[in-house]
């Protein structure tokens, strides 16, 4: 019997669902354009060395690679579009003066699945602001994300803001033993205050810094900024990340962004993000519908150093949120992996 099934983690999108994704992408690009972002189209394949240059070590396992028959080069199917944007920006300074505002959409393919039911091929639309740093650029990305979520019609969208270096400064000041650092970051990702306290007790830093480590698990919700200020007074290295976060929030609020939450104990994207981070949420979505942040170290890897910030919207999760809000089911699910198959995945964007 002819087997017409798809590989694990992949799926077909039928006309109605495809139309929803196309409509979402069109609405997003309408907002991107109004903010001055210009669209680029990028190839599905890149040389492996270019792709690897732009990924965090944890993301390298997501790369699907093979030898190109014609040239013999090792190439990769893109697992992330941001490194491609960085490569383009570095390769074409004549066409892309700084700062450059670029937007895109398209699929990315990951070798792994992060959890059962999550597709390996993800459809995204996003923006990158290259060559601009500071609170004004941070706020621009934050406002653009909020406006994008509103434009596509999500009900009660919410943006959550953090900073990659706040928790990092506290962990460094606590001087945890090397063998405990990974476990401490994992505990922070689970908001496990007890495990953080146990790790901090073995630190060699000041008592103030060690006491601050378990408090990182509670830096969200009402009063989060007040609690963060108290930590920053005890851990001087945390003061600058907090100030950067508050500066961006002040500008964004002046520009009308209201539904913003804070989580300064965010552990996502360690080693990739260098400043403010953010995520977009909406009722009915299985996870964040958008992720992004500042990644000032990336452009230098491609030979054109400079600050950069951006985000990507997961069109599938956004569609899922809209369909559930309107009572139209649960969206399209991929073929699940077998017990021997992969896991489902997403990158820290």
Swiss-Prot record:
Its main location: cytoplasm. Pfam families: tRNA-synt_His. It comes from the Bacteria. The keyword Amino-acid biosynthesis applies. Keywords: Amino-acid biosynthesis, Cytoplasm, Histidine biosynthesis. One of its GO terms (biological process) is histidyl-tRNA aminoacylation. Signal peptide: none annotated. InterPro entries: aa-tRNA-synth_II, aa-tRNA-synth_II/BPL/LPL, HisRS-like_core, HisRS/HisZ, HisZ. Residues 325-349 are annotated as: Disordered. It is found in: Cytoplasm. Heteromultimer composed of HisG and HisZ subunits. Belongs to the class-II aminoacyl-tRNA synthetase family. HisZ subfamily. Required for the first step of histidine biosynthesis. May allow the feedback regulation of ATP phosphoribosyltransferase activity by histidine. This is ATP phosphoribosyltransferase regulatory subunit. It comes from Anaeromyxobacter dehalogenans (strain 2CP-C).
